[in-house]
Design a protein with these regions (language model features):
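Positively charged, helix-rich recognition surfaces that bind polyanionic ligands
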Residues: 2-5, 13-184
Length: 184
């Protein structure tokens, strides 16, 4: 175990009644022995991302899978009298469903981002304006559920930790129309 300097400690309380101590520790990052590859990533709704090697990672859609249970628990909550103990118990049940979805999504994003960082030295991602894309009310739930921004943030901070390169390709760059071999 590495010895680092503890900057601060924060106690967090979740809506489900759990407490967590969050430690901010400063230490020197260890260089990761990655394979030195290069990869381009295109995120999507059906597939979470497709890479330039032809691999596709399916979108787990945790929110969609838990939607029935979430709707049922929220419906029960709406029928409880405000201020009652039963309403508070039901509020915790709704929060537990949300917490489970969040934990599943975070685990998936951490695993995928770490896998990409370990296998590749250079990762090219599209510079998407996710906030603007969320304005499309038909796609907003799917885009939010996929958590592209969080995934890009994880790739960015992990690349800084381990000395990898992240290249943000402009949205209008015709990358899919340019041959990677000859340039035409």
């Amino acid at each position: 175990m590495e010895v680092g300097k503890i900057n601060n400690v924060t106690i967090e309380h979740t809506p489900t009644g759990k407490y967590f101590a969050v430690l901010n520790i400063e230490f020197e990052p260890q260089p990761m022995n990655n394979k030195g590859g290069k990869i381009g990533i295109d995120v999507g709704i059906k597939e979470f991302y497709s890479d330039s090697n032809g691999n596709e990672v399916p979108n787990p859609k945790y929110l969609e899978k838990s939607m029935r249970k979430l709707m049922r628990e929220q419906r029960k909550l709406s029928r409880k009298e405000k201020g009652s103990k039963n309403r508070n118990k039901q509020r915790v049940k709704v929060a537990l469903v949300h917490e489970k979805i969040t934990n599943q999504r975070n685990d998936f994003l951490q695993n995928e981002s770490t896998k990409l960082i370990r296998e590749n030295q250079t990762i090219c991602i599209e510079d998407l304006k996710v906030k603007n894309m969320m304005r499309n009310h038909k796609m907003a739930q799917h885009i939010g559920s996929a958590s592209w921004s969080k995934f890009f943030d994880m790739l960015t901070y992990k690349s800084v930790w381990y000395g990898n390169d992240i290249v943000k390709v402009p949205t209008m760059y015709p990358s899919s129309q340019t041959c990677s071999c000859c340039g035409f």
